[in-house]
Amino acid sequence: MSDLRRKGWWNVPDYFHSPLVFDMEEDKEDYIFGPHDEYLHTLEVHSNTLIQLERWFTPTGQTRVTVVGPLKARLWVMDMIRKVGSKNNLDQIKGKMMLLQIRDHPLRDRDLELHPESGSSLWITTMNDTTFVEVPHFSRFPLTVAWLFCGFVRILGIHNFADLHW
């Protein structure tokens, strides 16, 4: 992560392709980014991402959140937000710990390593050139699906779980 800061990750065009985009309730936004976005800049600097908040974007008053930056950093931010908003108490605690961590100090390389957890709500399995993702029906936040194809990473955003058939 320190290499990204020294080299200026914002100078790499690939980090701006396929941004992570999702809608968030106002109370979750205030909890994560602070009142009047007090923690927004700190979260951006510590995660090497750029986060754009568009308030009242949806008819229901939700905020549209767009995150760009290195893929692993975007996935970490997504995981933190998903866990903070989870109905599962253990995931909520993990999410709150991640939130406190990112407010306190920059992410390290070991923070960005993917560790499949037993009972995790996101399972990724690779078979041949296809990646399958299984998502539980109780997820509250949108999911971004990433897969590697011929050396290129492609991101798919699912913005509304209600559109999916379980």
From Swiss-Prot:
Q: Does the UniProt entry include the keyword RNA-binding? A: yes
The UniProt entry, under InterPro entries, shows: KH_dom_type_1_sf, MOEP19_KH-like
Keywords from the UniProt entry: RNA-binding
Q: Name one GO molecular function term.
A: RNA binding
Q: Where is the KH domain?
A: 19-78
Q: Which family does it belong to?
A: Belongs to the KHDC1 family.
Which PANTHER family does the entry mention? DEVELOPMENT PLURPOTENCY-ASSOCIATED PROTEIN 1/5 FAMILY MEMBER, KH HOMOLOGY DOMAIN-CONTAINING PROTEIN 1
Q: What is this protein called?
A: KH homology domain-containing protein 1C
**What gene makes this protein?**
Khdc1c
